[in-house]
Amino acid sequence: MTKDKIAKDSYRKLLYFFENKIWVHFKDFDKIFYNGLIIDLNEDKMTMVIQERVRGEFPFLLECVNPDSIAKFNEGGN
C-alpha cells in the first residue's frame, strides 16, 4: 500500500471521530499506540493533531497511522 493510499484511508476513518469529538485509539506502524481527542485534521496536508490526557498534543502525518488499527477509545478496556 502506498503512503498516499494509507494517508487517504486514515483520513477517511478519522474524520468521523474528529467531527463527532469522539476519543480515538490507533497505532502507528511501529506498533506504538495512541489514545486521544483529534483537535485538528487537515485533508490537504494529510496531518492531524491529537490531545492525549497525559502526554499533551501530538502532531501526526496520516501516512504513519495504521488505518486498520483505528477504533473508538474505550477507557478501561471495555
For the regions a protein language model found, what residue spans apply to each?
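Short, conserved beta-turn/loop elements at beta-strand boundaries and strand-helix junctions
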Residues: 41-47, 75
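Beta-strand residues in well-ordered beta-sheet regions across diverse protein folds
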Residues: 49-51
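Short glycine-rich, low-complexity segments
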Residues: 1-35, 53-78
